[in-house]
């Protein structure tokens, strides 16, 4: 279950399950039939409450024909099957109590290098464990950096 924050011009996604390594929370993105090349994925935690950031992340890509996300079985792992999503040190350094500063000045984006340039249509992010109780993200980017 995912919810988008309301009542504010700043929206976020909140997933009410922490997941586990055996049963992670998964988000699948469809970049369209002819996506631009990319080599990085960027995540911004929900800056009002960075403790709801995921601890671990797995990134996979696919070009399979999608009718429903659970139908894709040929995912290609990109990088480690268990990479650090956000570390306690990173989050503590950005938890200054004035989250608006991070939007206007510092732009806390955690970038994940995918290695080579790629243009796969689907990206699946698998997340598990959290520094608090849920997973919250303000924004997710796909970019060629």
Predicted regions and their residues:
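Extracellular carbohydrate recognition and processing domains
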Residues: 72-114
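Aromatic, loop-rich ligand-recognition surfaces of beta-strand-rich domains
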Residues: 3-74, 105-145
């Amino acid at each position: 279950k995912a919810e988008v924050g309301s009542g504010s011009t700043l929206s976020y996604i909140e997933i009410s399950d922490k997941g586990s390594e055996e049963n992670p929370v998964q988000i699948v993105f469809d970049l369209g039939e002819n996506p631009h090349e990319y080599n990085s994925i960027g995540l911004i935690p929900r800056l009002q409450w960075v403790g709801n950031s995921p601890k671990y992340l797995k990134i996979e890509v696919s070009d399979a024909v999608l009718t429903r996300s659970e139908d894709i079985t040929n995912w290609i792992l990109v990088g480690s099957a268990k990479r650090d999503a956000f570390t306690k040190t990173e989050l503590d350094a950005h938890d200054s109590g004035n989250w608006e500063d991070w939007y206007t000045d510092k732009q806390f984006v955690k970038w994940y290098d995918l290695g080579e340039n790629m243009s796969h249509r689907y990206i699946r992010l698998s997340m598990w464990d959290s520094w608090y109780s849920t997973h919250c993200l303000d924004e997710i980017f796909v970019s060629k950096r």
